[in-house]
């Protein structure tokens, strides 16, 4: 077992280690297993150029100084260079270790045993100010080890940002908080502008793709509750494609999302983060992503962001501006 200290030690994917806070975690969220035998060559449209601009380095410096995690880094997002070079980042709250282990996700998995950085809400707000953000996306790991799933901590962070500047728009990509409505209310009762929760995949593939504690209809019921409780809050969800689903199943998932009042949906290509994760079953063409967007808009979504490189928070501020949603 390896231990993280002040000297940076490379931890191999799939191995167990001890964090700075004394609890154990698994690197990249999936234990070592036999490498998936299916490998599909990545098409040209998915190849990204690295660009370490001054703005990129500024974002990296600010998040490091304030001890913040970003989903950009932890989930190995392919858009990190583009987003950071434009001065935007998706801040991941409550640490970099998740209590769940979805088979597509490279965030480390473990039991933080109640650990939280009490200074994180204020540190996050200060980072947002330093980055001059007008629109900020917050997300977090799942924290099933906490009584309220971390909802109170999450809400405190939103409030700290709004107290800093009430004109800053906040999108909260939250856990499901185990479906406990009192915990969801803590987020709703802030001045949050958008609440998102990702359905990730079609109903048939939910069990093999997501952690057993997550659920297709659990996510949809969460989004239904938010819209019923506070109709003025925009709701959003996201689908990964390339995991073995059919286009018909994607359209059915769109219908299910619309049935609970979801306003915005994003669709992007799943890319295997390590050899231990689910393999890619197909690469969807840019033309097919354009078709998903056309169909989604016909189904009544206010906006559909659809493309090979699209992720839930990708260009989130621009998504809304295109439809003049006053965000």
UniProtKB/Swiss-Prot annotation:
Q: Which cofactor does it need?
A: [4Fe-4S] cluster
From the UniProt record, list the reaction(s) this protein catalyses. Answer: [[Fe-S] cluster scaffold protein carrying a second [4Fe-4S](2+) cluster] + N(6)-octanoyl-L-lysyl-[protein] + 2 oxidized [2Fe-2S]-[ferredoxin] + 2 S-adenosyl-L-methionine + 4 H(+) = [[Fe-S] cluster scaffold protein] + N(6)-[(R)-dihydrolipoyl]-L-lysyl-[protein] + 4 Fe(3+) + 2 hydrogen sulfide + 2 5'-deoxyadenosine + 2 L-methionine + 2 reduced [2Fe-2S]-[ferredoxin]
Q: Which pathway?
A: Protein modification; protein lipoylation via endogenous pathway; protein N(6)-(lipoyl)lysine from octanoyl-[acyl-carrier-protein]: step 2/2
Q: How is the cofactor bound?
A: Binds 2 [4Fe-4S] clusters per subunit. One cluster is coordinated with 3 cysteines and an exchangeable S-adenosyl-L-methionine.
Residues in Radical SAM core domain copies: 83-302
Q: Which GO terms describe its cellular component?
A: cytoplasm
Keywords in alphabetical order:
4Fe-4S, Cytoplasm, Iron, Iron-sulfur, Metal-binding, S-adenosyl-L-methionine, Transferase
Enzyme Commission identifier(s): 2.8.1.8
Under InterPro entries, the record lists:
Aldolase_TIM (IPR013785), Elp3/MiaA/NifB-like_rSAM (IPR006638), LIAS_N (IPR031691), Lipoyl_synth (IPR003698), rSAM (IPR007197)
Question: Which Pfam families does its entry note?
Answer: LIAS_N, Radical_SAM
Residues binding [4Fe-4S] cluster 1: 72, 77, 83, 313
NCBIfam families for the chain: lipA (TIGR00510), PRK05481.1 (NF004019), PRK12928.1 (NF009544)
Which HAMAP family has this protein been placed in?
Answer: Lipoyl_synth
Can you tell me which family this protein belongs to?
Belongs to the radical SAM superfamily. Lipoyl synthase family.
Its recorded name reads Lipoyl synthase
- Native organism: Francisella philomiragia subsp. philomiragia (strain ATCC 25017 / CCUG 19701 / FSC 153 / O#319-036)
């Amino acid at each position: 077992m390896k231990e993280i200290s002040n000297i940076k030690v490379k931890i191999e994917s799939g191995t167990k280690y001890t964090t700075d806070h004394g609890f154990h975690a698994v690197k990249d969220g999936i234990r070592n297993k036999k490498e998936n035998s299916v490998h599909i060559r990545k098409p040209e449209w998915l190849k990204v150029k690295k660009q370490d601009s001054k703005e990129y380095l500024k974002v990296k410096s600010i998040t490091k100084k304030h001890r913040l995690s970003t989903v950009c880094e932890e989930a190995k997002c392919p858009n990190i260079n583009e987003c950071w070079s434009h001065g935007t980042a998706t801040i991941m709250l409550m640490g970099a270790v998740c209590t769940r282990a979805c088979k597509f996700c490279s965030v480390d998995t473990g039991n933080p045993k109640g650990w939280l950085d009490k200074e994180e809400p204020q540190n996050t707000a200060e980072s947002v100010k330093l980055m001059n953000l007008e629109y900020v996306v917050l997300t977090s790991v799942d924290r099933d080890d906490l009584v309220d799933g971390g909802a109170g901590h999450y809400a405190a962070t939103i409030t700290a940002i709004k107290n800093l500047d009430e004109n800053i728009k906040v999108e909260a990509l939250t856990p499901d908080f185990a479906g406990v409505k009192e915990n969801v209310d803590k987020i709703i009762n802030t001045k949050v502008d958008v609440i998102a929760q990702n359905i990730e995949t079609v109903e048939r593939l939910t069990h093999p793709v997501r952690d057993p504690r997550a659920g297709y209809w659990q996510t949809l019921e969460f989004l239904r509750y938010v819209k019923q409780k506070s109709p003025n809050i925009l709701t959003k969800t996201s689908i990964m494609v390339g995991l073995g689903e059919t286009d018909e199943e994607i359209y059915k998932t769109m219908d299910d999302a619309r049935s609970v009042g979801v306003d915005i949906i994003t669709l992007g290509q799943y890319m295997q983060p390590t050899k231990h994760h689910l393999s890619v079953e197909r690469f969807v063409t840019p033309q097919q992503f354009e078709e998903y967007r056309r169909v989604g808009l016909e189904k009544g979504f206010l906006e559909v962001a659809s493309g090979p490189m699209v992720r839930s928070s990708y260009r989130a501020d621009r998504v809304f501006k295109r439809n003049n949603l006053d965000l």
